[in-house]
């Protein structure tokens, strides 16, 4: 699951995952409120599975990434999903907050395409090497 409001970054996420051989069907949410509603819906339903990984932007409309992360971590069904917080922010406070909310990894979005592709390696590591 990708929670990202920038279509260019969503494209780069797909490229990074594909470059590392990860075959995933990405669900994309463009704002935090929609992502929170989805997690709450998953908690209410017995049959739907949680995503295996969440790639979460911090600066989102309607509800920021940290609100989404709080919701995920308090979820009875999806609370243990690996979450990679990805942001263009270099603020130490953002990294500290992500760590305090139990994000599994923090990825600062680079301006270089080649460096952005390293997100795929991080996702692969979070998924335990599955393809």
Predicted regions and their residues:
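Conserved acidic segment of CheY-like receiver
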Residues: 1-18
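Acidic, metal-coordinating helix/loop segments flanking the phosphotransfer/catalytic sites
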Residues: 28-53, 116-117
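Acidic catalytic/metal-coordinating carboxylates
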Residues: 31-34, 64-70
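Short amphipathic alpha-helix used as the core "switch/output" element in two-component signaling
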Residues: 44, 66-79
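Active-site residues of response regulator receiver
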Residues: 56-57, 87
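The feature encodes the CheY-like receiver
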Residues: 61, 91
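Short, glycine/charged-rich "phosphate-handling" switch motifs in NTP-dependent
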Residues: 104
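A Lys-centered signature of the CheY-like receiver
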Residues: 109
């Amino acid at each position: 699951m990708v929670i990202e409001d920038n279509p260019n970054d969503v494209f780069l996420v797909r490229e990074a995952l594909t470059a590392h051989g990860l075959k995933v069907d990405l669900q994309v949410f463009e704002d935090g409120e929609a992502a929170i509603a989805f997690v709450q819906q998953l908690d209410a339903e017995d049959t739907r599975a949680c995503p295996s990984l969440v790639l979460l932007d911090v600066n989102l409309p309607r509800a920021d990434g940290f609100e989404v992360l709080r919701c995920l971590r308090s979820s009875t069904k999806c609370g243990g999903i690996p979450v990679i917080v990805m942001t263009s922010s270099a603020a130490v406070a953002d990294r500290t907050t992500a760590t305090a909310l139990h994000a599994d990894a923090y990825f600062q979005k680079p301006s270089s395409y080649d460096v952005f592709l390293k997100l795929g390696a991080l996702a692969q590591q979070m998924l335990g090497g599955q393809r």
